């Protein structure tokens, strides 16, 4: 919800995340329609792990959204974590309802991504490239593995302790606020 800056860049090493952003920006109606007509179902979720990765970028983005939103923990790696379902006794149903609200979220994201540059590079490389006093960096790396319950891997591109130290050094060198 922040106001736009003159130059904005979004970066993620995960090509599926970048593909999702590109599809949202290029044709949010098409992606929204795909999600709208995709059922919230265990079989749909399971199929994302059993089928080949679609060549069509919009089908690939919809598949990625199913994995992230219909499974527990929003994991982006290829580890199946189980289908997220609503159960009796909770204060409200949320899993299926959140899925039905996702197409509207796609349109909101499309509006926000207008004019934004999308990168798929290492965070250290992007931070170095944008090292200027008037550049604000918002950095949201994966948690350190040792700080996670059981050291579970969640992301397609995890960071080692050394990677975290390199990122910290790059952020400390950055001239901006």
Residue map of PLM features:
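Conserved S-adenosyl-L-methionine
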Residues: 1-40
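A generic structural signal for alpha->beta connector loops
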Residues: 5-7, 115, 175
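Acidic side chains
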Residues: 8, 12-16, 131, 140, ...
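SAM-dependent nucleic-acid methyltransferase catalytic core
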Residues: 25-138, 142-152, 166, 172-173
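Long, positively charged, glycine-interspersed low-complexity recognition regions
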Residues: 157-177
């Amino acid at each position: 919800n922040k106001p736009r800056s003159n130059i904005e860049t979004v970066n993620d090493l995960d090509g599926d995340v970048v593909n999702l952003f590109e599809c949202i920006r290029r044709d949010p109606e098409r992606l929204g329609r795909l999600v709208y007509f995709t059922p919230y179902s265990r079989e749909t979720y399971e199929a994302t792990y059993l089928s080949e990765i679609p060549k069509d970028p919009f089908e690939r983005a919809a598949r990625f959204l199913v994995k992230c939103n219909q499974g527990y923990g929003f994991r982006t790696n290829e580890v199946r974590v189980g289908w997220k379902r609503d159960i009796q006794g909770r204060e409200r149903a949320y899993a299926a309802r959140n899925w039905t609200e996702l197409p509207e979220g796609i349109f909101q994201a499309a509006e926000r991504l207008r004019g934004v540059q999308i990168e798929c590079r290492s965070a250290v490389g992007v931070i170095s490239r944008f090292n200027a006093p008037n550049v604000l960096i918002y950095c949201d790396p994966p948690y350190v593995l040792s700080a996670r319950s059981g050291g579970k891997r969640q992301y397609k591109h995890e960071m080692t302790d050394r990677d975290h130290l390199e990122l910290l050094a790059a952020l400390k060198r950055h001239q901006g606020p």
